[in-house]
Amino acid sequence: MSEKVGAMGGNKGGAFDDGVFDGVKKVIVGKDFNNVTYIKVEYEKDGKFEIREHGTNRGQLKEFSVDYPNEYITAVGGSYDTVFGYGSALIKSLLFKTSYGRTSPILGHTTLLGNPAGKEFMLESKYGGKLLGFHGRSGEALDAIGPHFFAVNSSLKHFKPQGGNGGSAWDDGAFDGVRKVLVGRNGKFVSYIRFEYAKGERTVPHAHGKRQEAPQEFVVDYPNEHITSVEGTIDGYLSSLKFKTSKGRTSPVFGNVVGSKFVFEETSFKLVGFCGRSGDAIDALGAHFAPLPAPTPAPAPAPAPVPVPAPAPVPAPSPAPAPSPAPAPAPAPAPAPTPAPAPAPPNKVEALGGNGGTIFDDGAFDHVRKVYIGQGDSGVAYVKFEYEKDGKRETGEHGKMTVLGTEEFEVESDDYITSAEVSVDNVFGFKSEIVTSLVFKTFKGITSQPFGMESEKKLELKDGKGGKLVGFHGKASDVLYALGAYFAPTTNSITPSTPSTAKKLQARGGNGGASWDDGVFDGVRKILVGQGNDGVAFVTFEYNKGSQAILGDGHGKQTLLGTETFELDYPSEYITSVEGYYDKIFGVEAEVVTSLTFKTNKRTSQPFGMTAGEHFELKEDGYKIVGFHGKAGDLVHQIGVHAVPIFTNYRCVF
């Protein structure tokens, strides 16, 4: 459902109405010496992009793009004024506000003070609804313009945003359902949320806030499962979130449960969208719920056929009775199947380190997939473990993250951790020993880098039976005091001779920003690169998975310079290597990526950025690139890739 807001401007020219789309990706505005003469809008509908143009005199063109579909336009503003000799008003300038809290440059004419020239206007939905289309009037110029915004359908149950009035309002709208939720924190508050919605067969992501710490995720088994309840707390900002589903599952609590509590829940309804307010944190959160579809009635059983009686058979004369054979001996009863032995319980190995802090115990899982380690001034201040249990990912985090961020160690799918080396030391200001460094070793012989500062006292955390590490426990507060683990027996069904299909090539660049990893997909469809004044400020990648195009998270921060696009002819074209440069720039502590160039099996892209500094190349012969990882803050500090073998089909001719 949409809300049509009245057009601002003059009453000449011919009326136009583009109608309602799924969203707006890009707006191009042209001007002459006096007013706005032309507008070109790139809309998206059901995964396809459509263009609408109004006005005829293109003049001087300027473009405004959003990080679509994560970001969308929430307000349309500008100015209009009467033009001498025309007898009516024309649009003199346009500007746009987005769900990221960004405001576009003024596209058109300004005053000497840099404000829109003429009578200013700002058109927006009451709750920050998404821009879905434009209407207005045009001839040789743009006479008037108005927007269509998303509006809540009367069949939906709308929960108004709970929280403060800071930040910018946004409303993602209503979809078929929710596939995944990602929640990121910054200290005690929720600073970032990303929702992956279902729209038919497509996945539509929307992100809000500022990504700082690595987000945690909650995956819904859509379409077999849906979210029935959203619970959270507000303490000035959003401080925690929790979800319940139709299968009786409850997500982990994301954040700290402090402040006033809210619950969004409606019997026989399911969650289909979110709204709220955000800036550098999530100020407020609301939701849209839709009624569950009525269950399809079971078909009535077909009536059973009426049996037709067969004619009575004529009895044949009875033969002479044969002598009865001796009865066969009864077969011996089959032996009862031997029940499979119950798996041995995991072995809990005592924590190594000091006695400070609070005890934590994550328990035992099927696998440890990834470890994040954050350093402090004196040792390991923070750890986060990413586990897998029955195919589902869970996380446990302990300690306190510092401004130094985190480093990570990822375990390949055909490998597992067998031991950890724990360095401990007595550090001034702490009453007991603390963990100063961690090193992890795996079954395939991989040894991680030392995370932290190694000390003379090194302790080995293992069970002595060749077991597989499946969970952690220990003690922590503002630092990690002690670390122990659970080990499960293994039959070594995983062998080092079976390599993982995908290779993760080490990221190149500086050590600033927060780690990110998009993961492994079938291929790459499109790359968007945004430049800053001194290097690459922003990247995002559109991947392919099965039959779906999936737009990954944006990494870095977009600037007013916008983005440039490199689009592949997928699936016949694929990336074979990434080349680039990284360098130290004034005012930034760690090196940043200054340039990126992408090579495919068909061509080479233009260089995005400035080719200055240390050169690098990410390439594996016989492999194609199917995912990216790295580090980013306000700039892109590192870039790395995931690559898989290229398989070629050969035809034999006889």
UniProtKB/Swiss-Prot annotation:
Domain Jacalin-type lectin, residue spans: 2-151, 156-291, 346-489, 502-645
MF annotations from Gene Ontology: carbohydrate binding
PROSITE patterns: JACALIN_LECTIN
Amino acid composition bias (Pro residues), ranges on this chain: 314-346
Tissue: Expressed in flowers. Detected mainly in ovules and styles of immature flowers, but also in pistils, styles, stamens, petals and embryos. Not detected in leaves.
InterPro entries: Jacalin-like_lectin_dom, Jacalin-like_lectin_dom_plant, Jacalin-like_lectin_dom_sf
Record has Cell cycle as a keyword: no
A Pfam family of this chain: Jacalin
Ranges for region Disordered: 314-355
Lineage: superkingdom: Eukaryota
Keywords: Lectin, Repeat
The family this protein is said to belong to: Belongs to the jacalin lectin family.
Protein name according to UniProt: Myrosinase-binding protein 2
Gene name for this UniProt entry: MBP2
